[in-house]
Amino acid sequence: MNYEVKKLEKSAVEVKLHLTAEEVKPIVDKVLAHVGEHAEVAGFRKGHAPKEVLMTNYKDHIESDVANDAINANFPEIVDKEKLEPVSYVRLKEINLKDDLNLTFDIDVYPQFELGNYKGLEAEKKSFEMTDDLLKEELEIMVRNHAKLEEVEDAGYKAQLDDTVDLAFEGFMDGAPFPGGKAESHLLKLGSKSFIDNFEEQLVGYTKGQEGEITVKFPAEYHAAELAGKPAQFKVKINAIKKLRQPELNDDFAKELGYASLDELKAKTKEETTKRENDRIENEYVSALLDKLMETTTIDVPVSMVQAEIQNRLKELEYQLSMQGFKMDDYLKMMGGNVETFAAQLAPAAEKKVKIDLILDRIAKDNNFEATDEELNQRMEEIAKMYGMDVPALEEELKKNKNLENFKASVKYDIVMKKAIDEVVKNAK
């Protein structure tokens, strides 16, 4: 085996691999034997086609398999000799198979970089003070979040913006109903812009039981092409009008939330708000320190690592949307984009995240930080508690999905990264 390794930009390397006829022959014979077992060639019984015929009929397939087998057999030695740390799959660029084999491929490797000085970094760290006004604001939010819709009993009451109506409707286009344009009982908050055009505003002033007809125009970019940009008429009927009624802030309200009294609720709210705000301030401070460190650390980030981070973010968004009953494509269409455009928008933040992870990983390695069994067990207990279970139950659940070891590895990684962050903070001015 002969090879050459050439450094490319973005922490990629190009490898030119040469195998002599003697070295590549066993690989070719093995691939031909496998292809020959399954190949169906006119004029020959299955499994009896000559090698020359197979090479002609299945040239691309055979060359690809030979190349992959050759890389799998020889690349580990190259990695070891050149001290490479691959972070992506091999990308084949050129295959030249005759008697001998010449391959050209590239692969992303863990970037080599000089870490900037993280000792003595400076960043502003704000302070937090809990005030009566902030407590009042937090309690008001809590009350609003526990407001309930109650039907308006006054038969003459006219619907207003911010009211919620129980609505029956049927849509027509050119006098004919269209699919998906009918409902017998749909809750709609007026002014929420949930419906197209000025549909909601036209319902202002309606009373319970009132029927009518409104005209709207579908937006030009509407997801259903057959409706996009066209006018439509809706027959409507108000089944009921509802208003949000907020509970009174008193002991009874506190007890509904599981507290002994309003005073206890206030004390707990102060405590939780103080922790939340101090955590936010700490996160902003750490982020500012890491931004400073990034300014003094040049890293040629591999494209594959950025793409992997983008994919992680897309999967997380897809999961969150599925929990709300949305499909990713439909959501992005409503936002005026698609997966490709959204991925491009995510790229700068994804690259920054990868850079920070690489910096923290280097700090962790330089300081020999590791996650102890005790730290892992403690974190597993905290996670289990979040899900309302004990550690054995959590581990059993993870085993069902064959994800226990990966999960523990991820937890260990987070522990080590936290130690690296603490090291940066400890050494800041």
Swiss-Prot record:
EC number of the protein: 5.2.1.8
PANTHER family: TRIGGER FACTOR CHAPERONE AND PEPTIDYL-PROLYL CIS/TRANS ISOMERASE, TRIGGER FACTOR-LIKE PROTEIN TIG, CHLOROPLASTIC
Entry GO CC: cytoplasm
Primary location class: cytoplasm
Function description: Involved in protein export. Acts as a chaperone by maintaining the newly synthesized protein in an open conformation. Functions as a peptidyl-prolyl cis-trans isomerase.
All copies of domain PPIase FKBP-type, residue ranges: 162-247
Keywords from the UniProt entry: Cell cycle, Cell division, Chaperone, Cytoplasm, Isomerase, Rotamase
SUPFAM superfamilies per UniProt: FKBP-like (SSF54534), Triger factor/SurA peptide-binding domain-like (SSF109998), Trigger factor ribosome-binding domain (SSF102735)
Domain notes: Consists of 3 domains; the N-terminus binds the ribosome, the middle domain has PPIase activity, while the C-terminus has intrinsic chaperone activity on its own.
Family stated for the protein in its record: Belongs to the FKBP-type PPIase family. Tig subfamily.
Name recorded for this polypeptide: Trigger factor
GO BP annotations listed: 'de novo' cotranslational protein folding; cell division; chaperone-mediated protein folding; protein transport; protein unfolding
A Pfam family this chain is assigned to: Trigger_C
Keyword hit for Cell division: yes
InterPro entries found in the cross-reference section: PPIase_dom_sf, PPIase_FKBP_dom, Trig_fac, Trigger_fac_C, Trigger_fac_C_sf, Trigger_fac_ribosome-bd_bac, Trigger_fac_ribosome-bd_sf, Trigger_fact/SurA_dom_sf
Enzymatic reactions: [protein]-peptidylproline (omega=180) = [protein]-peptidylproline (omega=0)
MF-aspect GO terms: peptidyl-prolyl cis-trans isomerase activity; protein folding chaperone; ribosome binding
Subcellular localization, as worded in the UniProt entry: Cytoplasm
Native source species: Fusobacterium nucleatum subsp. nucleatum (strain ATCC 25586 / DSM 15643 / BCRC 10681 / CIP 101130 / JCM 8532 / KCTC 2640 / LMG 13131 / VPI 4355)
Name of the top EC class for this enzyme: isomerase
Organism domain of life: Bacteria
